[in-house]
């Protein structure tokens, strides 16, 4: 069990309740978002623990508690963020897993396994007109426009649902979709009705459940690595 706490410590326990060697680890600021665990270096390599911290930094720890080279990284501009929950997906087609974060400044940032930013998720990747407190939701990742590149879907506090192209970082046609209340829930991507096409599902702050048909095939066996909250 791996757990991030508001006391700034990252904990890891064995099934018998004892600490995993190397844990807990003090990351220096509260851990308010959900952590993500995945194999950044490929399927045969040890797990990495990706931790969003309230000072706007993203830490990556290995299974023994040691830090991964190149991390922590800060969401630009430095300090923006309250520990937004990351998604893990290959965003540039190099066969390795990247870290996807929707920041409070209204932009999506992607970092590779070395901590470097992944283009085009640097300048053109705005999902919201808000420049602070833009979202409490986590991004989800799948190829929803059929071009073979993973796209990012995320909601914002203005009540809109954005979908950004993995090829360009720009808003996909037909988005953003307006809702009557803040899009605080993390969306999910699925074939909900069995028609072979993609549906986008989310809940707004007013408690309304939204489901949209998206007229392209849903292919979970393909590049749909993070289609819902983990």
Which sequence ranges carry the predicted segments?
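Extracytoplasmic/lumenal domain signature
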Residues: 1-230
């Amino acid at each position: 069990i791996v757990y991030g706490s508001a006391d700034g410590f990252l904990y890891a326990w064995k099934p018998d309740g004892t600490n995993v060697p190397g844990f807990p680890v003090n990351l220096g600021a509260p851990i308010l978002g959900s952590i993500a665990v995945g194999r950044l270096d490929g399927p045969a390599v040890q797990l990495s623990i990706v931790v969003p911290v309230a000072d706007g930094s993203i830490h990556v720890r290995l299974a023994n508690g040691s830090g991964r080279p190149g991390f922590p990284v800060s969401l630009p501009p430095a300090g923006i963020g309250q520990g937004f929950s990351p998604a893990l997906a290959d965003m540039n087609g190099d066969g390795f897993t990247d870290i996807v974060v929707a920041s409070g400044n209204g932009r999506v940032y992607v970092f590779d396994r070395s901590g470097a930013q992944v283009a085009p998720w640097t300048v053109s990747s705005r999902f919201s007109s808000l420049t602070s407190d833009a979202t409490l939701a986590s991004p989800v990742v799948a190829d929803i426009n059929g071009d073979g590149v993973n796209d990012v879907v995320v909601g914002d506090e203005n009540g809109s649902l954005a979908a950004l192209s993995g090829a360009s970082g720009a808003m996909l046609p037909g988005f953003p979709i307006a809702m009557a209340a803040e899009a605080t829930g993390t969306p999910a991507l699925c074939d909900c009705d069995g028609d072979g096409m993609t549906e986008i599902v989310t809940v707004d702050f007013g408690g309304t459940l939204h489901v949209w048909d998206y007229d392209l095939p849903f292919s979970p066996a393909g590049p749909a690595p993070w289609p819902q909250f983990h």
